[in-house]
Amino acid sequence: MIKNKKVAFVCAIHQSEAHRPNGFELFNDYLESIYTSCKYPFKLFGFDNESDDKFEVENLLDNLVITRVDDQYKGGCTYTWNEGIKMAIKEDYDAVIITSDDQIYDETVNDFIDTILTHEHKDNAIFGPLSNNPNNDYQRAYQPNGKIWEISGKPTEELNGFCLAMTRESIQHNYFDSAGNFFNTGKEYIWGKQDVEVQQRVEHSIVVGTCYVYHIKQGGWREIRAGLRR
């Protein structure tokens, strides 16, 4: 664990009776996994992306912020990612991990953070863990393998967008625009392209095989929006 470093998690949340009735249950399980596993000082920036019901927390913790987005046509997941990154940068977090509510973390998340903060390319790199459901072969695994390696980041060989992490310096070196957006602000009819596009700007794409994330991959909420496909 690297001393005097703090981490921000950015998480998109969605619940709907038609497409994702268990959305809040997923998020509760996600929260439990982060709060029981992460040893670094952290803050979780959650975005309730136009859920049918409003996510409410009794006795809200100081390091948990939930922002309600009333219209996900405003930009979908990408909007929440960008807004969460802006909040994290404003509050001087050293690393930012982009996630969604259908993921479960264990203590290997600390190895993930160690690598993000100490890797030789940390000032211009984007990082991703291993997972059971990464939509590619090079991140697919069912446990950590202890290896850390670079991939090209080009289309068909990029980190999957389910979990992407960067240092503050990498974000500041690779903004998409002057408004402080890190990801392409295009509408999500190009869903699946934002995570590809950003890796064309960031110089290095790194697979962190010391970390494993269980990805439930329940993205049915995307069907709400016409033309939205991953």
Description of each model-found segment:
Residues 24-42:
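Short, acidic, metal-binding catalytic loop of nucleotide-sugar glycosyltransferases
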Residues 41-51, 67-71:
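Short beta-strand/loop segment that forms part of the nucleotide-sugar
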Residues 106-182:
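Conserved catalytic core of nucleotide-sugar-dependent glycosyltransferases
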Residues 23, 180-230:
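C-terminal catalytic/acceptor-binding lobe
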Residues 18-19, 47-57, 104:
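A conserved acidic beta->alpha catalytic loop
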Residues 71-88:
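Glycine-rich, basic loop-to-helix element that forms the pyrophosphate-binding segment
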Residues 5-11, 34, 43-46:
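Hydrophobic targeting segments
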Residues 93-104:
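Short beta-strand-to-loop acidic/aromatic patch adjacent to the donor-nucleotide binding site
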